[in-house]
Amino acid sequence: MLGRAIRSMEVMVHSSTFLLPKLHQPANSPAKKYALVVLNQNLPRFVPRLWTHAKLRICADGGANRIFDEMFQMTNDPDYESTRKRYIPEIIEGDMDSIRPEVKQFYSSQGSKISDKSHNQETTDLHKCISRIHRCTPDHEKTNLCVLVTGALGGRFDHEAANINILYLFSDMRIVLLSDDCLIRLLPKTHKHEIYIESSVEGPHCGLFPVGAPSGSTTTTGLKWNLSEAKMRFGSMISTSNIVHAEKVTVQSDADLLWTISLRNLT
């Protein structure tokens, strides 16, 4: 019964073309629009590439310090001030307890919208940023919007857990958490998933596992160690240190799963 239900599900297509110098989409996937959210952690080396691809750039509070301080090191522009003025976020959102006063003043003078949410201490800065994007994006456009989040992995584990929780809180949106080493995305149980591997920028190591609720049946193709109606839960078996073996990985499950894949040394 479960197998028949899953096979009839709509297919959700995923790819990491946003990591490439030039965007392209799988033939059967509609064109994606990207939004970039920068958190207050060291910038991954490929942030300038993401910045170029994104139509909307939001800094979460102290993420503005990172753009102000670190983008110059990632570009070939010898003019420090020119680099700063070229990378201006459309919005800076958060409780404003981390952004430095001179950084806030600079971006405000360059036209960035400063959205002070210091009155709201119930949610994280990332939650505030994603809430804004979710609120401002019509429902029919959400499936073709992909939100890229840098600085979401690494540092304190409770911060990482809160960031992963965002994937579940906003499961109707495509959100990708990124670090220099890997990415994480949610594969909702409501869909069958096709993941197109960009082997020049990602892989081969990958993982697939449920968080919060167990999976009673997960089936994959395209991996070195495929799953066939496998049960997964913490305290038992989960798929880690797996290897992608094909250009396309497929996943079907009765539970929401996290997909993670290693990133190559991008410059």
Curated annotation (Swiss-Prot):
InterPro entries: Thi_PPkinase, Thiamin_pyrophosphokinase_euk, Thiamin_PyroPKinase_B1-bd, TPK_B1-bd_sf, TPK_catalytic, TPK_catalytic_sf. Its EC number is 2.7.6.2. One of its GO terms (cellular component) is cytosol. Gene3D superfamilies: Thiamin pyrophosphokinase, catalytic domain (3.40.50.10240), Thiamin pyrophosphokinase, thiamin-binding domain (2.60.120.320). CDD domains: TPK. It comes from the Eukaryota. Keywords: ATP-binding, Cytoplasm, Kinase, Nucleotide-binding, Transferase. It is found in: Cytoplasm, Cytosol. GO terms for molecular function: ATP binding; kinase activity; thiamine binding; thiamine diphosphokinase activity. GO terms for biological process: thiamine diphosphate biosynthetic process; thiamine metabolic process. SUPFAM superfamilies: Thiamin pyrophosphokinase, catalytic domain, Thiamin pyrophosphokinase, substrate-binding domain. It catalyses: thiamine + ATP = thiamine diphosphate + AMP + H(+). Pathway: Cofactor biosynthesis; thiamine diphosphate biosynthesis; thiamine diphosphate from thiamine: step 1/1. It holds the Pfam family TPK_catalytic. NCBIfam families: thi_PPkinase. Belongs to the thiamine pyrophosphokinase family. PANTHER family: THIAMIN PYROPHOSPHOKINASE (PTHR13622), THIAMINE PYROPHOSPHOKINASE 2 (PTHR13622:SF6). Catalyzes the phosphorylation of thiamine to thiamine pyrophosphate (TPP). TPP is an active cofactor for enzymes involved in glycolysis and energy production. Plant leaves require high levels of TPP for photosynthesis and carbohydrate metabolism. This is Thiamine pyrophosphokinase 2. It comes from Oryza sativa subsp. japonica (Rice).
